[in-house]
Every structure is written in structure tokens, then in C-alpha cells.
């Protein structure tokens, strides 16, 4: 019996009790919540449903809790139901009911924990979207990990997710990039507003390999040659790095296409139709302050050139016209102003601002030997995705970046995350999976297979804790998806790994020496099989490997 099953039982029981006592059944909340008490001595689960209902239906909370508890004790799978405090209901499950989660996990396999919670949604998930002027830096790497994990997480809940990279190939930064390449190719100093670093020299040399006469071309043609080839080379490197990191995209949208295909003009025309565009001081303005932004925004500047927001407007409209009912943007710490701006853009088009969600990620700091590792893209000392992977590996890099809420700055201790110790969270979780895999191999050598026919034998305290944690997985995924918080998967896996290690230390799974195998051994093997499956499922959502051996 999962927490969701128990919640449904509690709701149906409470409904029957209210009816029996001629009380208002409509007072019941849409969802009845059961929680695991902090003190296991209070039971397996607890609910405050009686406290929620009492005032609404005019009943004494303890008396109402008593009625519900008495009815619950007659239900299949409930070992006891007791009233505590002002009206809490503490519940204990029968072992056989609790252990049914093992069957559910084994039957569902890699699909365990999936639901149709978001089946009605077509989601555009835009993340990373770094300028093609340099390698992916550590901040962008955080989004590469978190964004990919969020996409996987939403997919487990039935959402149709498209991962999209907005390719910023329009604007002044691309011109500065091209000028930096030209200076490097000529052996000249980097322009004051340019990009520096060995990667600039490398790309400049590769441009000359592809276009040996580039430096002898007229200035405009030379600039365009370095711009076009340089951007293509840089972005190829970005995509390759992301792929090796385990992050791939379904769609790459070029910012330049928003301008070259007339999408910006179409967006402005659409806004004129809604009356949310006006002219002032020779410029074209969006009435964004009417929709929650702190001020109106210039869309077309007085010189006739589109402002940056023009591309954003066209891009949002493009997404909506492609059928996305939810557009999630994952942006850096310096983009807080974009939350109101993008929601205002949606409202200006006559769309629901709720179709736009903006997640803001905080800074990532690397620490080596207790000292921060500095980064500066323009100074050429940028810490890149490739650097992080080289230092601690793909799995540790992804896990370390996903593990904390995105609105929290994080420090990544390179020594910790590269260590083979229980203090390293990803090692701790992966070791649990490897340990379970070794156990399965050893069982096979003994001719033992998991057996779910006698799960009622799983009555040890540590077995009960492990079963309840396994049962939490589907609900945790729903919560993590609803809140857009994949870090919850990491924290759950660490709890599950800890519960498994403690179970393993207390409960012998395989017979020793000449000991005859028993039904308890094979029931514990089934519990281990289920635990291994859930760990693999969770790591899969994170894009982290589940090793068979370590």
C-alpha cells in the first residue's frame, strides 16, 4: 500500500464517517494527505484530516478522529489506527499491505513512479541558451544538468516535453566575437570589448584552415567570414560538450531567424492589433507596465533597429503557435527582471501569463583546497563544462549541480565530489546500486531468485522503513515535477540509499555457509530487487549512471 493508496482509503473512510453522522461530506479536501511521522514510534503514517474537518462540520476534532480511526481498523491492510494529541490519526499498516509496494515496483520496472499528472501539457523547456562566443561556463553547466533532469522529470508525469536551445546569433556580442577572432588571426591584441582566451586563438586558426584567404578579403567580407565560420565552430563545440555531458536538445532555434523570417514584424503587428504598442520619441513601445512589468519597454528603437526584447516577443509567439501551453525559461541570476517582462509579453498578446514560467538559477562556485576557483569569461580564465567534467566526471558534475534548489548558490568542493567516500553524495547513492547489483549476482550463483509470494515475512523494523521509503517515490516525483524541483530526486535517493544500507547491515539477505535458503531470504531478495529498481529509476531521471560494479 503506497501513501497514495492510504490517502484514498482515508478519504473514502472519512466520507463514510461523515455520512454516518449526518455531517457535510463536501467539507472534505480534494486531496487527503498522509505523512510519515518524524518519530517512528507514532506509527507508519499520520493524518490531520480530522483537524481539517472538525471546525467545518461542527464536530469535536478528537471525537471525529476517533470515529475515523475506528472505521479504519476494519479496513484491509490497517493494523492499527489511534488518535493522538488534539486529533491526529496515527496509522500502522499490516506487513502484507505495506509490502505490496514491492510487487508494484517489480511489475512497473522502469515505469514505476510515472503518472499522468501532466499528460494534458505540451511543454517547451528552454535552457542553457548560451551565446556562441565561448565554451559553456559553470553557470550554464548548472542549467545543462538541471534543465535536462527537469525535462526527464516532467516526462515521467506524462508531459510532452520539447527541450530547446535558443541560439543567440544576433546582435553586438557576435560582432565582438568576430572582431576578437580577426585580431587573434592577425596576431593583434584583443579588442577592449572583445573575448580572450586560448579558445579564441584556436578557433581563429581553424577559420583560417577553412578559409585561407580570409584575412585578405575586404573588411565587411572578412568580418562575415570570421563571424559565420567562427560561430559555427564554437557552437559545434558547445553541442559536442553538452552531448558528452548527457544533455541533448530536440530543437535549436536561431535568434537571427526571428529577424530574418519576419517573425519580429509579425509579433509587433499582432501587438498593434491588441492595442498594446504605441509610438513615443520616434521609438515603438510595448505597454508592458500595464501587465505587471516595472516599466514600458522599447521594442523598436528610434533608429529603426529592434531592441533585444523584440526577439523575445517573437520567440514567445513562435512557441505558442507551435502549440506549447507551458513555456519554461531557465535563466541566470542576472535575469530577475525577465520574470515580469516575459509574463507581461504573454499578457500583451492576450495569452495567460501562467503559460510562462521563469526559473532563475544562482551562482556556482568551485572550491579547490579550500580556495575558490575564479572564473572570468572575458579574461580567458573561464571555468567550463569541460573543466568540471575533467575534474570530477560527468556523474558527479551532474549530481552536484542538480542536488540543490536552483535559487540557492552552491559551492562545489572538487576534492569531495571526486572522492570514493560516503561523504560524496553521488558515490553514496551509486554504491547502494552497485551493492544491490552484486547481491543479485551472488544470489544467482546460489540459484536463488526473488520471490514475492511471502512478502508478509518482511516484518523487521528496518524492512518497514525501507518499504515506506520505496512507497514515497511516486508521490515525491509528483511533488518535484509540480514544483519544478529535480533536486528533490537527489535528496530522496540519498534517504533511500541510507535506508537500504541500514537494512543490509541489520537483515541478512543471503544464507551463509551450509544454511538452507528460506522464504525470508527470497522475500528479502525481492525487496532488494525493488530497491535497486527505484534507485536506477531515480538516477535515470538525473541523467546519472546506475553502475553494476564499483
Swiss-Prot record:
Keywords of the record: Aminoacyl-tRNA synthetase, ATP-binding, Cytoplasm, Ligase, Nucleotide-binding, Protein biosynthesis
Q: What is its EC number?
A: 6.1.1.19
Its recorded reaction(s) are:
tRNA(Arg) + L-arginine + ATP = L-arginyl-tRNA(Arg) + AMP + diphosphate
Q: Name one Pfam family in it.
A: tRNA-synt_1d
Q: Which Gene3D superfamilies match?
A: Arginyl tRNA synthetase N-terminal domain (3.30.1360.70), HUPs (3.40.50.620), Isoleucyl-tRNA Synthetase, Domain 1 (1.10.730.10)
| Gene Ontology BP term (one) | arginyl-tRNA aminoacylation
Write down the SMART domains for this protein, in alphabetical order.
Arg_tRNA_synt_N (SM01016), DALR_1 (SM00836)
The UniProt entry annotates the motif 'HIGH' region at: 130-140
The yes or no answer to whether the keyword ATP-binding is present is: yes
Q: Which GO terms describe its cellular component?
A: cytoplasm
Q: Which family does it belong to?
A: Belongs to the class-I aminoacyl-tRNA synthetase family.
Per UniProt, subunit arrangement is:
Monomer.
Instruction: Please give the name of this protein.
Output: Arginine--tRNA ligase
Q: Which organism is it from?
A: Mycobacterium marinum (strain ATCC BAA-535 / M)
Gene that produces this protein = argS
Amino acid at each position: 500500500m503506497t501513501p497514495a493508496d492510504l490517502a484514498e482509503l482515508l478519504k473514502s473512510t472519512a466520507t463514510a464517517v461523515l455520512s454516518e453522522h449526518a455531517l457535510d461530506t463536501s467539507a472534505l479536501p480534494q486531496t487527503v494527505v498522509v505523512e510519515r511521522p518524524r518519530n517512528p514510534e507514532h506509527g507508519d503514517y499520520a493524518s490531520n484530516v480530522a483537524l481539517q474537518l472538525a471546525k467545518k462540520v461542527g464536530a469535536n476534532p478528537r471525537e471525529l478522529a476517533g470515529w475515523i480511526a475506528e472505521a479504519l481498523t476494519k479496513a484491509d491492510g490497517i493494523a492499527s489506527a489511534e488518535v493522538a494529541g488534539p486529533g491526529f490519526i496515527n496509522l500502522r499498516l499490516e506487513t502484507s499491505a505495506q509490502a505490496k509496494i514491492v510487487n508494484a515496483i517489480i511489475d512497473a520496472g522502469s515505469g514505476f513512479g510515472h503518472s499522468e499528472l501532466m499528460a494534458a501539457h505540451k511543454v517547451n523547456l528552454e535552457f542553457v541558451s548560451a551565446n556562441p562566443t565561448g565554451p559553456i561556463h559553470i553557470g550554464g553547466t548548472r542549467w545543462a544538468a538541471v534543465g535536462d533532469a527537469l525535462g526527464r522529470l516532467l516526462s515521467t508525469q506524462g508531459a510532452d516535453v520539447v527541450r530547446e536551445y535558443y541560439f543567440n546569433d544576433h546582435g553586438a556580442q557576435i560582432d565582438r566575437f568576430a572582431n576578437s577572432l580577426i585580431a587573434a588571426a592577425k596576431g593583434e591584441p584583443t579588442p577592449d570589448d572583445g573575448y580572450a582566451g586560448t579558445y579564441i586563438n584556436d578557433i581563429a586558426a581553424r577559420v583560417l584552415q577553412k578559409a585561407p584567404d580570409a584575412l585578405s578579403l575586404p573588411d565587411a567580407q572578412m568580418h562575415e567570414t570570421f563571424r559565420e565560420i567562427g560561430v559555427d565552430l564554437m557552437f559545434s563545440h558547445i553541442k559536442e560538450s553538452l552531448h558528452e555531458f548527457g544533455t541533448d536538445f530536440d530543437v535549436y532555434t536561431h535568434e537571427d531567424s526571428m529577424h530574418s523570417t519576419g517573425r519580429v514584424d509579425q509579433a509587433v503587428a499582432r501587438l498593434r492589433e491588441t492595442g498594446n504598442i504605441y509610438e513615443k520619441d520616434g521609438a515603438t513601445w510595448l505597454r508592458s507596465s500595464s501587465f505587471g512589468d516595472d516599466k514600458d519597454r522599447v521594442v523598436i528603437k528610434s533608429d529603426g533597429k529592434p531592441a533585444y526584447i523584440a526577439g523575445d516577443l517573437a520567440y514567445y509567439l513562435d512557441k505558442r503557435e507551435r502549440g506549447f501551453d507551458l513555456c519554461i525559461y531557465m535563466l541566470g541570476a542576472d535575469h530577475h527582471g525577465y520574470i515580469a517582462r516575459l509574463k507581461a509579453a504573454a499578457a500583451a498578446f492576450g495569452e495567460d501569463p501562467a503559460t510562462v514560467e521563469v526559473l532563475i538559477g544562482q551562482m556556482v562556485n568551485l572550491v579547490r583546497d579550500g580556495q575558490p576557483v575564479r572564473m572570468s569569461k572575458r579574461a580567458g580564465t573561464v571555468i567550463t563544462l569541460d573543466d568540471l567534467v575533467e575534474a570530477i566526471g560527468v556523474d558527479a558534475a551532474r549530481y552536484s549541480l542538480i542536488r540543490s534548489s536552483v535559487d540557492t548558490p552552491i559551492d562545489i568542493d572538487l576534492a569531495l565530489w571526486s572522492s570514493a567516500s560516503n561523504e560524496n553524495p553521488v558515490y553514496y547513492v551509486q554504491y547502494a546500486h552497485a551493492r544491490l547489483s552484486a547481491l543479485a549476482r551472488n544470489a544467482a550463483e546460489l540459484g536463488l531468485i526473488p520471490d514475492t509470494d511471502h512478502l508478509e515475512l518482511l516484518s523487521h523494523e528496518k524492512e518497514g522503513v525501507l518499504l515506506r521509503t520505496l512507497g514515497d517515490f511516486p508521490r515525491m516525483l509528483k511533488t518535484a515535477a509540480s514544483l519544478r524541483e529535480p533536486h528533490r530526486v537527489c535528496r530522496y535517493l540519498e534517504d533511500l540509499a541510507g535506508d537500504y544500507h541500514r537494512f543490509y547491515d541489520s537483515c541478512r539477505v543471503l544464507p551463509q555457509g551450509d544454511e538452507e535458503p528460506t522464504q525470508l531470504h527470497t522475500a528479502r531478495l525481492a525487496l532488494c530487487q525493488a530497491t535497486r529498481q527505484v534507485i536506477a529509476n531515480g538516477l535515470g531521471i538525473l541523467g546519472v549512471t546506475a553502475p553494476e560494479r564499483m
